Design a protein with these regions (language model features):
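Hydrophobic Val/Ile/Leu positions in short beta-strands of Rossmann-like dinucleotide-binding domains
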Residues: 7-9
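Short amphipathic alpha-helix with an adjacent loop that forms part of the alpha/beta core around
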Residues: 50-58
Length: 197
């Protein structure tokens, strides 16, 4: 492939898994899958405003935010990308599950998940998932249980959730690169390890 798609991934551990999956995804028409994306990395789970200011977005087509979303800089990174017309994919490890949201440059802001209050990001996200499920009459009982269980402590960051997120993210990137349809935020992808059918 002559012109690889430039991809920026922020996030250390999960960011590395996403980069690996994106480079080795089955792209059917590409004999050399490594040529599909040219990947740039910010290998930090917690961004600073200095990281965001120093971030060069020249030619970047897609960005993945796999940080912990634990401060304002993470959302400032999203806004900087969106101002440059870059689609942002949010990958979140929920322990034994993964949450992914694709944010259009001029779409509904992902930062709306975090409402003003005392909840940390993952609890706010859990409440968003729960309310979304209730609204569409598709309850997510395991997320309600997790919110109750982890209301006073952090969600566990298990390897299982990171691998699920990385695989889903690679599929979303492939679909975007091939011009296929994806769900845009406020819709999202949610994949628990075990789901009742």
């Amino acid at each position: 492939m002559n012109n690889p798609i430039k991809l920026l991934i922020s996030g250390a551990d999960m960011g590395g898994l996403i980069a690996s999956c994106a480079l080795r995804h089955d792209f059917h028409e590409s004999s050399r899958q490594e040529d599909r994306f040219q990947i740039y990395r910010i290998e930090k789970d917690t961004l600073t405003m200095e990281d965001v200011d120093a971030c060069d977005l020249s030619g970047i087509r897609y960005a993945v935010n796999a940080t912990l979303h634990d401060n304002e800089a993470s959302f400032t990174f999203d806004e900087k990308c969106k101002e440059q017309g870059i689609t942002v994919i949010h990958a979140v490890n929920l322990g034994k599950a993964a949450f992914l949201a694709v944010e259009k440059p001029k779409g509904y802001p992902f930062s709306e998940v975090v409402k003003k209050g005392t909840d940390d990001f993952l609890c706010s996200l859990g409440k968003y998932i729960s309310q979304y499920g209730m609204f569409w009459q598709m309850p997510v009982p395991w997320i309600d249980e997790a919110i109750r269980h982890y209301s006073n402590e952090s969600f566990p960051q298990l390897g299982i959730g990171a691998y699920i997120a990385a695989g889903y993210c690679a599929n979303i990137l492939a679909n975007l690169a091939e011009g296929k349809e994806v769900k845009y935020f406020p819709k999202f992808y949610l994949s628990p390890l075990l789901e009742e059918i």
